[in-house]
A protein has these predicted regions:
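Structured segments of extracytoplasmic/periplasmic soluble domains
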Residues: 12-13, 17, 21, 57, ...
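Catalytic His-Asp segment of secreted/periplasmic serine-dependent ester chemistry enzymes
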Residues: 120-169
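Hydrophobic/aromatic beta-strand patches that form the interior of the parallel beta-sheet core
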Residues: 4-6, 113, 149-151
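Conserved SGNH/GDSL esterase-like catalytic core that processes O-acyl groups on lipids
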Residues: 2-90, 94
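Charged helix-capping and loop-helix junction motifs
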Residues: 88-100, 129-136
């Protein structure tokens, strides 16, 4: 049994914070497969191989399920990465295709979770648009394979006081 977080800088800094605040005992049964500034192409070319290796390692130690939590998407929704706007609908479809295939390929003793892309403050990061994030999240939530449980951090944060620059326009 164990937990694997797969993601980008949000996952990387979550790992760093847990280690700094609580020490290595807090993450003894937690693996982090992450790379800052990356997204789906990194996952397909490097991250997935590491994730599968971690799944096999954790499954060999226990007969309990491994939880795999995906936290990817925000970097692929940045116009910095494309130079001239983002095909956010295409990005959502690419994620759906890969994640749904992955859900079929992985052992049934993996529990799959997908964490929504969090809201962004567009005053500080104008390269991302809230409407595109919401589309991406809504699309994934409604069309991911049923093996995935959706973790809606976006709505939780918006409901509990996080605000974005767009709200003030």
């Amino acid at each position: 049994s164990g937990i694997i977080f797969v993601g980008d800088s949000r996952t990387y800094f979550m790992q760093k914070t847990l280690l700094r605040e609580y020490g290595k005992d807090a993450v003894a049964k937690v693996s982090f497969v992450c790379k800052t500034g990356e997204g789906l192409s990194w996952f397909e070319t490097a991250g997935e191989r590491v994730m599968r290796s971690e799944i096999a390692r954790l499954q060999s130690d226990s007969d309990k399920p491994v939880a795999v939590i995906f936290n990817l998407g925000v970097n692929d929704l940045s116009s910095h990465n494309s130079g001239n706007g983002v095909d956010y609908k295409g990005e959502a479809n690419a994620y759906l295709a890969r994640m749904n295939t992955l859900a079929e390929e992985l052992e049934s003793d993996c529990r799959l979770f997908y964490m929504s892309v969090n809201p962004v403050n567009t005053a500080m990061k104008p390269t991302r648009k809230e409407a595109q994030l919401r589309y991406f999240n809504d699309r994934l939530q409604s069309r991911l394979n049923k093996r995935f449980q959706w973790i809606d951090t976006y709505k939780y944060l918006m409901k509990n006081g996080y605000s974005t620059y767009n709200e003030f326009k």
